């Protein structure tokens, strides 16, 4: 699937300066769908400054600026949770939680005499109406399963917020640059 959301942790050049090239590449690929950019307050101003070299795009850009220490943003099928981390500028980490539906219960489908041609549609959440019956996903699907969680943070000192937000993550990505004790002062800058 094409990229339709980009989350920015903060606006230091090494984290955002590649955006114009990415936008131009998307435009050259004939993208027309909107692109949502999420990041700390000031995102619109920063991106508009970078767009001097990519002013005309065949798709709209939407902005979501974060101001609170924590945000939860629901989308169809997944959720993004943003949380502040400890950097020398306002900086966010992100958790992406992908929802997972329950398992298809073959025995229930067979017991209800649901024709096989409807099974995959029911698994995808579709309700099937026939002249004789109405079949709904809840008739054949088990309870929702635990979602898949990815947590990402960068350019931060250790914080309780990271521990809290990375809890139960299936994948935790955290960049670290200054691990040696003699570079402790550099890490605090």
List the predicted regions and their residue ranges:
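Short acidic-hydrophobic surface loop/beta-edge motif
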Residues: 70-75, 128
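Active-site metal-binding motif and surrounding structural segment of the metallo-beta-lactamase
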Residues: 1-38, 62-70
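Active-site catalytic pocket residues across diverse enzymes, especially alpha/beta-hydrolases
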Residues: 23-26, 51-54, 98
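Active-site neighborhood of phospho(di)ester-bond hydrolases with catalytic His/Asp-centered motifs
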Residues: 3-12, 39-40, 150-156, 173-175
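Hydrophobic packing residues within well-ordered alpha-helices of enzyme cores
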Residues: 19-22, 47-50, 162
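Binuclear metal-ion centers of metallo-dependent hydrolases, dominated by the metallo-beta-lactamase
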Residues: 68-70, 158-189
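Active-site-proximal loop/helix segment associated with metal-binding centers of metalloenzymes
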Residues: 78-152, 156-165, 171-173
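A gly/proline- and charged-residue-enriched helix-loop-helix capping module
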Residues: 42-51, 63-68
